[in-house]
Swiss-Prot record:
The lineage of its organism: Bacteria, Pseudomonadati, Chlamydiota, Chlamydiia, Parachlamydiales. SMART domains: Elp3 (SM00729). Pfam families: Radical_SAM (PF04055), TRAM_2 (PF18693), UPF0004 (PF00919). One of its GO terms (biological process) is tRNA modification. Its cofactor is [4Fe-4S] cluster. Its main location: cytoplasm. It comes from Protochlamydia amoebophila (strain UWE25). This is Ribosomal protein uS12 methylthiotransferase RimO. The gene is rimO.
């Protein structure tokens, strides 16, 4: 089994990757030569985290070791997020912090989405960065580390998705892992610059995915989370129609006679077909959980956003999911303050959240991204109005989510118990099938005397609600 990586943070929303000191993969030499220790900080989404895990695997295979702390590292790698202004600012803050904490001889490599689109700003603000490596070019990490001069590679042309076999070192707890099945995006939503950053859709081959899936299961992973920019587009760059490639992949995974949870992230409403719903119903190993970004429900706004759906379509698919999979948990994301959004259209969004309560709702203020179609749209909304609408919708969302959670009180559900609460060992934390790691609430366990091992599934009776979390005890 691969050694377990720990997530520690310079800040709480960063993944700071460090290995346990007493473990080393047998195929990688364990040595403690000066100048060979590396440290990763991965920002942003799980897709970025997978890239960091692959880069780390490449370096460990080449004989490098992981430094347990930032200050001990000879090489520091920051995998940035550049999706929104707030994420770019976090990336800049992280670079500044790392530069202030690193030892003088340490080399800093900055990679990821922000490098792809804002490399000039990074070089101008932080001339002491040693190397810039573009998003998706994970195989360039070895060159970046070994280079004796400052350098730059801005290219995502050779993604590891197309490269076949690559090493990877997991940084998640041993019982779950992300599996990226595609990179890039073929859609052109008005507010988004992901196609510019990540390039066009590139699907990973089915056989390679199945090989990785089987490897994860053999390592003891019990929950595999499928990710892509858009799972529903998987295989369409290779000629697949509608959802056929994804359905075929899922069916092949389900042929494996083993217990596991399979979680699907990022499926657009127009891609949730009757066939997918039927497959989810037919095998409980597919978590009754869908991350379905709808962004808005006013048809005029949806059209301006270049979304291939309507309010009527969204209501229809939610209604169908509730009818066919009664215990389904639906996560979505909503944008307030999109150019031209009127108070009446915003109220329509509020009413929708109340009328069609969803289990998890992420709310974002529209970010005016240079290069996006929406950047030049008229009737831009003021920051003050965006902030006001954000807080008003958040208040409604909190009430709706809490009402949904209270319906769970008294139920006995399967929960993977993940460990002690970070603030006290009097509590344990876990998740049920309707909760995805890092983005959703958790189950707080106040009586875990029957828990024999973390990462295992236990039956928990829900007794209370605390904010976005459930409270219960193992029975």
């Amino acid at each position: 089994m691969l050694p377990i990586l720990k997530n520690q943070g310079v800040k709480k929303d960063q993944n700071h990757i460090a290995l346990k000191n007493d473990s080393c993969e047998s195929s990688s030499p364990c040595f403690d030569h000066e100048g060979n220790k590396i440290n990763f900080i991965s920002l942003g989404c799980p897709r970025n985290l997978v890239d960091s895990e692959v880069m780390l695997g490449i370096l460990l295979k080449a004989g490098y070791e992981v430094a347990p702390t930032l200050e001990e590292a000879d090489y520091l790698v920051i995998n940035t997020c550049g999706f929104l202004e707030a994420s770019r600012q976090e990336s800049m803050d992280t670079v500044e912090e790392v530069l202030s904490q690193r030892k003088k001889t340490a080399k800093l490599i900055v990679t990821g989405c922000m490098v792809q689109t804002h490399s000039d700003a990074l070089k101008t603000t932080f001339p002491s960065i040693d190397y810039l490596l573009g998003s998706g070019d994970v195989e360039g990490i070895l060159k970046a580390v070994q280079s004796t001069q400052k350098g730059q590679i801005i290219s995502s042309a050779r993604s590891y998705l197309e490269a076949g076999e690559v090493p990877r070192r997991l940084s998640t707890p041993k019982h779950y892992a992300y599996l990226k099945i595609a990179e890039g995006c073929r859609k052109r939503c008005a507010y988004c610059v992901i196609p510019t950053i990540k390039g066009p859709l590139k699907s990973k081959g089915k056989e390679q995915i199945l090989k990785e899936f089987n490897l994860l299961l053999s390592q003891g992973v019990k929950e595999v989370i499928l990710i892509a920019q858009d799972l529903g587009d998987y295989g369409k760059d290779q000629g697949a129609k509608k959802l056929t490639a994804l359905l075929n992949l899922l069916q092949s995974m389900l042929e494996i006679k083993q217990a596991f949870w399979l979680r699907l992230l990022y499926l657009y409403p127009d891609e949730i077909t009757d066939e997918l719903i039927a497959l989810m119903k037919s095998d409980s190993r597919i978590c009754p959980y869908l991350d379905m970004p709808i962004q808005h429900v006013n048809n005029q706004i949806l059209k301006s956003m270049r979304r291939a759906t309507s309010k009527e379509d969204i209501i229809e698919i939610i209604t169908k999911l509730r009818r066919e999979i009664p215990n389904v948990a639906i996560r979505t994301s909503l944008i307030v303050g999109f150019p031209g959004e009127t108070e009446e259209q915003f109220q329509e969004l509020i009413q929708f959240v109340q009328d069609y309560p969803l289990e998890n709702v992420g709310i974002f203020k529209f970010s005016r991204e240079p290069g996006s179609h929406a950047y030049d749209l008229p009737n831009q909304i003021s920051d003050e109005m965006k902030e006001d609408r954000y807080h008003r919708l958040m208040q409604v969302q909190k009430k709706v989510v809490k009402k949904n959670l209270k319906k769970m009180i008294g139920k006995k559900i399967a929960v993977v118990v993940e460990g002690y609460h970070p603030e006290t060992e009097l509590l344990m934390i876990g998740r049920h099938t309707g909760q995805c790691p890092d983005i959703d609430g958790q189950v707080l366990i106040n009586d875990g005397r029957k828990v024999k091992a973390f990462g295992e599934i236990y039956t928990v009776e829900i007794t209370d609600v605390a904010d976005y979390d459930l409270v219960g005890h193992v029975i």
